[in-house]
A protein has these predicted regions:
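N-terminal targeting signals for export/organelle localization
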Residues: 1-46, 182
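A short beta-strand-turn-helix
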Residues: 49-70
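Conserved hydrophobic/aromatic "anchor" residues
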Residues: 50, 60, 74-75, 117, ...
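Short pre-active-site segment immediately N-terminal to redox-active cysteine/selenocysteine motifs
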Residues: 68-70, 74-78, 143
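Hydrophobic beta-strand anchors of alpha/beta hydrolase catalytic cores
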Residues: 71-72, 102, 147
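Conserved redox-active cysteine motifs that mediate thiol-disulfide chemistry
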Residues: 74-91
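Conserved segment of the thioredoxin-like fold in thiol-based oxidoreductases
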Residues: 84, 92-132, 141-144
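Thiol/disulfide oxidoreductase modules built on the thioredoxin-like
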Residues: 116-124, 131-180
Length: 182
């Protein structure tokens, strides 16, 4: 009988560990970022237009920047790789590159969470809300961070995932330089 109770205890402990692991496992996919993979965007496609409200209260409309190079990033505060590459966007913003617009769109989080994150980190580049996932739905992907470089309305580079801020900065800067013909 003691052996049976001990076995039940071990099984219960394993189940608890599995449940805890599942609950706290980072989620890179979710309703905000997943979509019909048959509709995934590709380099050369026209970037779907969108209008987003930025954390400063102003709006960003992609089609208003059709003559510029636009770096669009989809991210969330709970996504470790997303948070890890944010310094790359700040550095690009600080470089003050003529002809470049940066817009980072938070996927389906409440505005207070995003505002708090931006304030805590002192980010000054364009960050926008997509609380209902409407913009993210236009840009289906398997995961975030998901970054696109758009030149004159056309997608020229797509990045899914991140390595570290320095590596991402170099990759994005190279793509932006090519986009701007530098």
């Amino acid at each position: 009988m003691k052996r049976f109770i001990k076995s039940i205890g071990i099984i219960a402990a394993i189940l608890v560990i599995l449940v805890i692991f599942y609950l706290f496992m980072p989620r890179v996919e979710g309703p905000a970022v997943s979509g019909n993979n048959g509709n995934a965007l590709q380099e050369g496609d026209i970037a779907p237009d969108f209008t987003a409200t930025k954390v400063d209260g102003s709006t960003f409309k992609l089609s208003d920047h059709s003559d510029e190079c636009v770096l669009i990033n989809f991210w969330a505060t709970w996504c470790g790789p997303c948070v890890g590459e944010m310094p790359a966007f700040q550095k690009l913003n600080d470089d003050d590159i003529d002809g470049l617009e940066i817009i980072c769109i938070d996927c389906q989080e409440d505005e207070k969470t995003v505002d708090s994150f931006v304030k805590e980190n002192g980010y000054t580049f364009n960050i926008a809300y997509d609380t209902k996932g409407e913009i993210c739905a236009k840009y289906p992907t398997r995961g975030i961070p998901y970054t696109l470089v758009v030149n004159k309305g056309k997608i020229v580079n797509i990045y899914v995932g991140a390595v570290d801020a320095d590596t991402q900065y170099k990759e994005y800067k190279s793509a932006i330089d090519a986009c701007l013909g530098e």
